[in-house]
Amino acid sequence: MNPRAKPGTNGDNPPPARMVLSLLRFASLLFFLLLLQVRPAGADWNPLVERLAADGFDRRTVEALFTRQEARFEPDAMAGKIRSLIQSLTPVPDSLAAKLKDAVQEKYLTSWMVARARSYLRENMSLLEEIQARYGVPKEIVVSILLIETHLGENTGNRIAFNRLASMALYPDLEAIRPYLGASLITPDNLEYARRRCREKADWAYSELKALLRLAARDSLDPMSIRGSIYGAIGLSQFMPSNIFAYGVDADEDGRIDLFAKPDALHSIANYLHKHGWKREVDIRNQERIIFAYNHSTVYANTVLAIAEKLRGRR
């Protein structure tokens, strides 16, 4: 017999039921306390609710949204944005800058990817020629953008756009997301820049959040059902919500602009480029400038143009 066993028990037997129950209760309490510790401090949505209500949104509707199970504070949205902005401050050597000027994303120029884009172009030729005639934007450019943005509509993002935008809008104060940035990222040299950009991006996200809510109300959609990219871009064409109002096209004339519907998405891409200056005869420099407006990256613009050239059979 185990000399340490309590009277009336065998040391090899399980403890009494009462002890097991006590241990389970203690474990549950410990888990709950740990959960409180790791829960993001920004889970209080009240400041955002107040701001939206002051801007005319129905308070009860907004409060109901933020109390739903799907509503989550996702600090990585703003943290990722600030991290990329700070990293962009690193000086680029002249030799590398010269290479980047003409750089492309090679993964979109493989024979397999170009073949997919060419097949998509053939399958949707009638629609794309209609778009080209209406906006003056070459069909190859439209398909190239679609290939890069969502792999021809196959990957439109699986994040809840509401959460991404609300999380960024909630905290214009850098200190609130600083714990998620890493200890060495913020330095005395970039601190003020990071603070300013955090405020600016929070304001931008708030404007986009309002546009998302207006879009959902207009089209009778559940805001939580709208999925998008890590920063809240939506649909095959990856438009921010405000751009849907500015450049979206109801091409299939069903009474709503649905960027998950092919006709609306492709027309909207071309309309965006057209509204930014694309004409039937536009030189290469202006082509680069206009595509850059769609996605602020020189490499992106270069890649769109390179894919389009391959689709035309010139490269």
Spans of features found by a protein language model:
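Cell-wall glycan-active module
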Residues: 1-5, 10-12, 16, 21-25, ...
